[in-house]
């Protein structure tokens, strides 16, 4: 799994020499903090007020409703530029968060209204990460790409820690209204900073193609005929379908019913997963370990499913935090190389569209969540983990075998050192 070659010019600090990135980085950080706080706040609110695990997983699924539209967002961004799309969507986040704050203040907030607002946000939220990655790829020199991706991943994981802890702590001390005032403020800060991001000129191919539909068709054709991209997409869909549900949508259920803790304990569990991811991102960004990207992605995926199964058998809060930290570590060892593999295998003119295609894999998460709700209620949490983990391990092996020349061969471009 190691590689002795040393990639040139991979100093992550160089990214801050680019003005656009100096604005984008804190804007993305504020957005990530708000996302994480919002997920914890509303997930706990729905579970506490409705007592329904099914409603909880419906809420989790609605957050990814727009993943099917991500390729369309990619086409629009390639044609119109990314700055306008970035600050426009973040203005919408701020307005909707302000609406939830007002509903809470006037004691008019209900689980049903939360689900409606979550559906609206869910139409555009999945494309936020696509816009971040594509914007980094198009505004920074190619030599700085991996360093910038490492920074982006580290800030995302640190935001998960801060969001999980702050979200739970603020609502416990100040209540829902004050907590959502903080969320709204973070979105406003993100909107303001996003205005400083440099405009990206539309792709030269945008004017050559006759219609956006042809742009979209070309993206599907491009990915379909690249085994590296197809294999990476398969891994992304698989971990969203069978691994992420236990660290995201089902975590409030585990906190309340398995670990018998409150929202503060839930925050610590979520922060543990994120802390593991942060440690892995720091490890990858240090460039001290020359790992073959695609092989690392496959092995980390298998380890993630195994740790999900161990977590299901854990009832002690501190042991659960440790297992989640390890799961977060291998999660980052899977997802960061996955992004690197896809960006390296993609021509620059297709970055927006291919990253939009990549976000389609997120659709695995709502499917996995919706399937897990009835399973947990009928066969129990542990048995559900058994089913998901066993399927995950089997399908990971199948992916590695089917695309072995593209993903496992040490001479493949997918296995260039990280």
Predicted region positions:
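Flexible cytoplasmic inter-helical loops of multi-pass small-molecule transporters
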Residues: 2-9, 195-221, 409-416
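Substrate-agnostic recognition of the 12-TM MFS/MFS-like secondary transporter fold
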Residues: 23-39, 62-75, 81-96, 113-172, ...
């Amino acid at each position: 799994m190691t590689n002795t070659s040393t990639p040139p010019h991979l100093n992550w600090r160089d990214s801050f020499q680019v003005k656009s990135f100096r604005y984008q980085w804190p804007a993305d950080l504020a957005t990530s903090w708000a996302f994480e706080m919002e997920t914890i706040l509303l997930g706990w609110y729905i579970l506490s007020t409705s007592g329904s695990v099914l409603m909880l997983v419906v809420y989790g699924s609605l957050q990814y409703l727009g993943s099917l539209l991500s390729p369309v967002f990619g086409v629009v961004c390639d044609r119109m530029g990314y700055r306008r799309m970035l600050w426009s969507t973040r203005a919408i986040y701020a307005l909707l968060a302000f609406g939830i704050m007002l509903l809470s203040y006037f004691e008019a907030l209900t689980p049903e209204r939360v689900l409606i607002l979550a559906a609206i946000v869910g139409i555009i939220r999945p494309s936020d990460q696509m816009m971040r990655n594509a914007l980094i790829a198009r505004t920074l020199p190619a030599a700085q790409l991996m360093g910038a991706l490492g920074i982006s991943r580290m800030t995302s994981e640190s935001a998960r820690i801060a969001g999980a802890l702050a979200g739970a702590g603020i609502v416990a001390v100040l209540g829902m209204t004050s907590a959502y005032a903080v969320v709204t403020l973070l979105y406003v800060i993100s909107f303001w900073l996003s205005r400083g991001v440099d405009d990206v000129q539309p792709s030269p191919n945008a004017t050559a193609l006759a219609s956006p539909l042809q742009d979209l068709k070309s993206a599907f054709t491009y990915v379909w005929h690249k085994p590296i991209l197809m294999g990476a997409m398969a891994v992304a869909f698989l971990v969203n379908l069978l691994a992420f549900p236990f660290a995201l949508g089902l975590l409030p259920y585990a906190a309340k019913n398995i670990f018998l803790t409150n929202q503060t304990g839930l925050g610590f569990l979520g922060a543990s997963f994120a802390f593991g991811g942060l440690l892995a991102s720091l490890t990858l960004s240090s460039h001290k370990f020359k790992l073959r990207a695609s092989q690392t992605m496959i092995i980390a995926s298998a380890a993630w499913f195994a740790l999900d199964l161990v977590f299901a058998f854990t009832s002690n809060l501190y042991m659960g935090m440790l297992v989640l930290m390890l799961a977060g570590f291998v999660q980052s060892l899977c997802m960061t190389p996955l992004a690197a593999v896809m960006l390296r295998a993609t021509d620059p003119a297709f970055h927006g569209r291919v990253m939009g295609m990549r976000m389609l894999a997120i659709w695995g998460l709502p499917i996995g969540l919706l399937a897990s709700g009835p399973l947990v209620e009928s066969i129990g949490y542990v048995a559900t983990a058994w089913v998901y983990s066993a399927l995950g391990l089997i399908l990971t092996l199948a992916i590695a075998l089917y695309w072995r020349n593209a993903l496992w061969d040490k001479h493949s471009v997918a296995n260039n050192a990280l």
